[in-house]
Amino acid sequence: MSGVNDIRSTFLDYFKKNGHEIVPSSPLVPRNDPTLMFTNAGMVQFKNVFTGLEKRSYSTATTSQKCVRVGGKHNDLDNVGYTARHLTFFEMLGNFSFGDYFKENAIELAWKLVTEGFDLPKHRLLVTVYSEDEEAATLWKKIAGFSDDKIIRISTSDNFWQMGDTGPCGPCSEIFIDQGENVWGGPPGSPEEDGDRFLEF
């Protein structure tokens, strides 16, 4: 991959081939959402779908959402310039299922994307799961062949997603790549986690 355009097109094309509707990025200033100054995540344009207030013509979607994070729950502003991975503006690539598939299919799609679509070396990958989510840990072993040392259990909000104080929520899983010993930092959940060695994507 030679750059961001290749990454974006590989991601969107992969999910389109797997039955997802490509949905354009919504505006940076959300329409009809007084809770946000800026769109800060890919799911923002689907809030009403997740809560059952709106129905779309598709049950799976993929996006490359333009996002700004300068305050609130997802404030990256304080980390800009201190890490190699924090910016205020970025594109969030996402895939969404609205009652179509669940955890097993999501993990399988993610694994095939990173190992076949992006051709990342399997031996350098590891995942995090919410500490109480045995199902996800079992699925990562089954689908990716991971041993326990490649599955890091996190008990904090880092692996429990919630839309807000109320509403949709649940455990999540993240994939990390080890960038090598020449990059400072420790694996997720360690005291050295804030380094850039283990990059989440």
From Swiss-Prot:
<keyword id="KW-0963">Cytoplasm</keyword>
<keyword id="KW-0820">tRNA-binding</keyword>
<dbReference type="GO" id="GO:0000049">
    <property type="term" value="F:tRNA binding"/>
</dbReference>
<dbReference type="InterPro" id="IPR018164">
    <property type="entry name" value="Ala-tRNA-synth_IIc_N"/>
</dbReference>
<dbReference type="GO" id="GO:0005829">
    <property type="term" value="C:cytosol"/>
</dbReference>
<dbReference type="GO" id="GO:0005524">
    <property type="term" value="F:ATP binding"/>
</dbReference>
<dbReference type="GO" id="GO:0002161">
    <property type="term" value="F:aminoacyl-tRNA deacylase activity"/>
</dbReference>
<keyword id="KW-0648">Protein biosynthesis</keyword>
<dbReference type="Pfam" id="PF01411">
    <property type="entry name" value="tRNA-synt_2c"/>
</dbReference>
<keyword id="KW-0547">Nucleotide-binding</keyword>
<comment type="similarity">
    <text>Belongs to the class-II aminoacyl-tRNA synthetase family.</text>
</comment>
<protein>
    <recommendedName>
        <fullName>Alanine--tRNA ligase</fullName>
        <ecNumber>6.1.1.7</ecNumber>
    </recommendedName>
</protein>
<dbReference type="InterPro" id="IPR018165">
    <property type="entry name" value="Ala-tRNA-synth_IIc_core"/>
</dbReference>
<dbReference type="GO" id="GO:0045892">
    <property type="term" value="P:negative regulation of DNA-templated transcription"/>
</dbReference>
<dbReference type="GO" id="GO:0004813">
    <property type="term" value="F:alanine-tRNA ligase activity"/>
</dbReference>
<comment type="function">
    <text>Catalyzes the attachment of alanine to tRNA(Ala) in a two-step reaction: alanine is first activated by ATP to form Ala-AMP and then transferred to the acceptor end of tRNA(Ala). Also edits incorrectly charged Ser-tRNA(Ala) and Gly-tRNA(Ala) via its editing domain.</text>
</comment>
<dbReference type="InterPro" id="IPR045864">
    <property type="entry name" value="aa-tRNA-synth_II/BPL/LPL"/>
</dbReference>
<dbReference type="GO" id="GO:0006419">
    <property type="term" value="P:alanyl-tRNA aminoacylation"/>
</dbReference>
<keyword id="KW-0030">Aminoacyl-tRNA synthetase</keyword>
<keyword id="KW-0694">RNA-binding</keyword>
<keyword id="KW-0067">ATP-binding</keyword>
<dbReference type="InterPro" id="IPR050058">
    <property type="entry name" value="Ala-tRNA_ligase"/>
</dbReference>
<keyword id="KW-0436">Ligase</keyword>
